Design a protein with these regions (language model features):
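N-terminal secretory/targeting leader peptides
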Residues: 1-28, 37, 44-196
Length: 196
């Protein structure tokens, strides 16, 4: 499992796939990102860089959590320091809102929030929980502004080391795991949204 944004930081050129508001709900995600042209184009770009994007999974829509104040209008974002991934589209989005984006690694996010380096976090509710920051966040704003995809990926070298039968079995298992992960991650995120 690897987030497409993580792959972008290594190979570049993938940022078009998560432009703000390009996809606004999971029906669109399923049609274009999981089963459609976005998946097809990402798969080609991965292959051009020696990677096999075996099956799409899930990383959910990005939201904004912070410890300072509720966000009821764009003006409320002014001056908030928000942890974002090292993705230009995320940084530009928060800059346009008047916030101060801070590109900080996922592994350093909790410490940055606890130390006051940032006031908030941009990520999915599911990932905020996984990062350990959801319990620290006082206010969640459901922006749903950007879908963040992921995939089960392997190197071309590993893929080519398998027989055709092994590749088919690997692909089937990856497709099943991706579908299972999407279903459970979306259900878990919906449960978390109902309590935040």
């Amino acid at each position: 499992f690897v987030a497409d944004m993580g792959v972008d930081s290594a190979i570049g050129g993938l940022g078009w796939a998560w432009l703000p508001f390009m996809l606004t709900d999971y029906d669109q995600v399923d049609e274009y990102y999981i089963n459609g042209w976005i998946n097809d184009e990402l798969t080609k770009q991965y292959a051009d860089n020696g990677l096999i994007r075996v099956a799409p999974t899930e990383n959910c829509f990005r939201e904004c959590g912070n410890v300072k104040r509720p966000i009821n209008s764009m003006a409320d974002m002014t001056g908030l320091k928000i942890r974002v991934p090292e993705t230009q589209a995320c940084q530009d989005f928060y800059t346009a809102l008047g916030a101060i984006p801070a590109a900080i690694a996922t592994s350093e996010t909790l410490a940055a929030l606890e130390q006051g380096t940032v006031d908030g976090v941009d990520n999915s509710i599911y990932n905020m929980k996984s990062m350990g920051v959801l319990e620290k966040i006082k206010y969640i704003t459901m922006l749903n502004y950007m879908y963040s995809g992921a995939s089960i990926t392997c190197s071309e070298e590993f893929w080519n080391s398998m027989t055709a039968n092994q590749q088919a079995a690997f692909k089937q298992a990856a497709d099943e795991a991706g579908a299972f992960f999407r279903e459970n991650m979306r259900a878990d995120e919906q449960d978390r949204k109902s309590v935040v």
